[in-house]
């Protein structure tokens, strides 16, 4: 009737519009993002997997998945989402004992969950909030996991000298 045609002329529809889908990121943007993470991601995956070749398998699979999914996240969430996907890779969930020539032997000897927490901070460079989100933990639980990963000093406190040594070793490997 006349009411419907008036609504149509005014651009008013009886159904609300769906918001437009976010534009897909360009393949060049995704490639640049992955290139920017490459050194950190390789060290992370090799150390978490306990084996460089299994780490490489995880990186290749995650790059494909990330490239297909990146459009659903704002750019600011890409780092957190990338590390979350990497941690979910089967070859990083079922980890081996570290190889004798592990790049970060002190960290590589940790159990898989604390190893991932330490690597997210020292190698991936994530802050506590992003690292906790990548692991699906609260910030408090993430910080406890880091604390619990450290050996204790003679006073029973987490040994910050070990943390400093791990940080220095990670930095050396990233600068190679």
Predicted regions and their residues:
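Extreme N-terminal basic, low-complexity initiation segments
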Residues: 2-8
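A short, charge-rich alpha-helical start-of-domain segment used by transcription regulators
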Residues: 10-43, 53, 67, 72, ...
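Σ70-family region 2.3-2.4 aromatic/basic alpha-helix that recognizes the −10 promoter
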Residues: 38-46, 56-96, 104, 146
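Helix-turn-helix DNA-binding helix
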Residues: 55, 131, 142-143
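Short amphipathic alpha-helical boundary/capping segments
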Residues: 101-111, 133, 138, 153
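Short amphipathic alpha helix immediately N-terminal
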Residues: 109-130, 134
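DNA-recognition helix of helix-turn-helix
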Residues: 135-168
């Amino acid at each position: 009737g006349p009411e419907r045609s008036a609504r149509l002329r005014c651009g008013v529809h009886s159904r609300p519009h769906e918001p437009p889908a976010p534009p897909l990121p360009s393949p060049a943007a995704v490639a640049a993002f992955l290139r920017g993470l490459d050194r950190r991601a390789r060290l992370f995956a090799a150390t978490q997997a306990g084996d460089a070749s299994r780490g490489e398998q995880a990186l290749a699979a995650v790059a494909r998945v990330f490239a297909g999914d990146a459009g659903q996240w704002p750019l600011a969430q890409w780092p957190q989402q990338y590390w979350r996907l990497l941690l979910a890779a089967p070859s990083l969930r079922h980890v081996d004992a570290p190889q004798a020539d592990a790049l970060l032997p002190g960290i590589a000897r940790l159990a898989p969950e604390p190893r991932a927490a330490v690597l997210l901070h020292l190698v991936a460079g994530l802050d506590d909030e992003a690292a906790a989100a990548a692991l699906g933990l609260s910030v408090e639980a993430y910080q406890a996991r880091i604390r619990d990963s450290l050996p204790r000093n003679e006073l029973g406190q987490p040994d910050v000298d070990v943390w400093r040594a791990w940080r220095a070793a990670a930095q050396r490997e990233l600068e190679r």
